[in-house]
């Protein structure tokens, strides 16, 4: 049986010391680019695999980042997580996914304990991080950011799309199309992002001189039977346009309308993941630049790891309508 290639084997083949090979493998700046490339090329040809466990024991780092989310069926999360994971992998980090099985859309102490027990280096949360969870994490001093939802306490760095502007843009679009009674199928009122979208929607109606009818705003989960009931309810209220808090909901609304041969209702969504859904017909959707959000949020998190500080930032990214 062929013996496993060691660091010393690579060093001998390269004509350098094991110390130099180790420095090259860890991308240290005191090793020239040419030497690094030569060592990495020969190591690859020899089938050398770096012992990350040994490296992590020396550095105290697991080279692992936790990503916490609460909706594995939504292509929006899958797409963004894939982009973040790709960036982290390129920078030498692996990813462990944590799912909110309680479906309460918050990172509480129960879930935080589960995350911290795995010895991750840092945390990316797609759900709201509670004050008690932040307090628990402060003991461990793990860098943490919140993505997709703003924080009311302003004590955690957040990277979000401009949900308020999104609500305004989509409502203006429907008004310009001639719609007057616009319903809004929204998620739970506990989600700040969804509240911000409603605020944007209301602000445009008010500016346009349209009386805000609270009965046209529905808060629910993504259960399809609830969406069906909400759609019929808005039809009974003579709505000629329906805004949905995400594209999955918009797809369910369109499905119900088409099954009932209704084609004169404008339906809009958020997130622009239409290409990932079996939709019966295209519909307008609010979108943001996921590539930029993924790159900047991950870069900030890794900077926190390398140069710890108490700096808190709230980055809000512009959105636009995709028709």
Spell out what each predicted region is.
Residues 20-23, 57-73, 173, 182-188:
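Short beta-strand segments enriched in small/hydrophobic residues
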Residues 168-210, 309-323:
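An alpha-beta-alpha
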Residues 88-100, 202-225, 321:
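Short beta-strand elements in bilobed, periplasmic/extracellular small-molecule ligand-binding domains
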Residues 38, 76-90, 166-169, 192-211, ...:
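Short, solvent-exposed amphipathic alpha-helices that sit
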Residues 230-241, 245-323:
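Flexible loop/turn connectors
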Residues 2, 6, 60-172, 232-237:
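Alpha-helical recognition/docking segments in bacterial nutrient-uptake
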Residues 157-184, 199, 203, 223-232, ...:
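Hydrophobic alpha-helical segments within soluble ligand-binding/sensing domains
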Residues 1-61:
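N-terminal helix-turn-helix DNA-binding module of bacterial transcription factors
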């Amino acid at each position: 049986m062929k013996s496993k290639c060691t660091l010393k084997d690579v060093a001998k083949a390269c004509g350098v010391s094991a110390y130099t090979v180790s420095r090259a493998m860890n991308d240290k700046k005191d090793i020239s680019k040419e030497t690094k490339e030569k060592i990495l090329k020969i190591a690859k040809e020899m089938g050398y695999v770096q012992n990350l466990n040994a490296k992590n024991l020396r550095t105290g780092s697991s080279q692992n980042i936790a990503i916490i989310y609460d909706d594995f069926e939504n292509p929006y999360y899958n797409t963004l997580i894939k982009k973040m994971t790709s960036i982290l992998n390129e920078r030498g980090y692996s990813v462990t996914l944590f799912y909110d099985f309680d479906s309460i859309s918050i990172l509480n102490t129960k879930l935080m304990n589960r995350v911290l027990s795995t010895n991750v280096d840092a945390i990316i949360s797609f759900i709201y991080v509670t004050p008690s969870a932040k307090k628990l994490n402060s003991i461990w001093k793990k860098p943490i950011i919140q993505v997709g939802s703003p924080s009311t306490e302003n004590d955690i760095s957040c990277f979000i799309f401009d949900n308020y502007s999104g609500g305004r843009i989509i409502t203006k679009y429907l008004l310009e199309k001639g719609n007057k009674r616009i319903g809004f199928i929204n998620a739970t009122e506990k989600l700040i992002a969804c509240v911000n979208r409603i605020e944007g929607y209301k602000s445009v109606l008010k500016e346009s001189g349209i009386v805000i009818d609270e009965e046209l705003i529905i808060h629910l989960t993504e259960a399809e039977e609830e969406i069906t009931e909400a759609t019929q309810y808005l039809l009974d209220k003579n709505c000629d346009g329906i805004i949905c808090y995400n594209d999955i909901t918009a797809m369910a609304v369109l499905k119900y309308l088409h099954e009932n041969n209704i084609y004169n209702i404008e339906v809009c969504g958020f997130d622009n993941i239409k290409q990932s859904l079996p939709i019966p017909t295209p519909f307008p959707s609010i979108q943001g630049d996921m590539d930029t959000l993924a790159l900047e949020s991950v870069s900030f998190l890794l900077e926190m790891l390398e140069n710890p500080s108490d700096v808190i930032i709230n980055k809000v990214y512009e959105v636009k309508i995709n028709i």
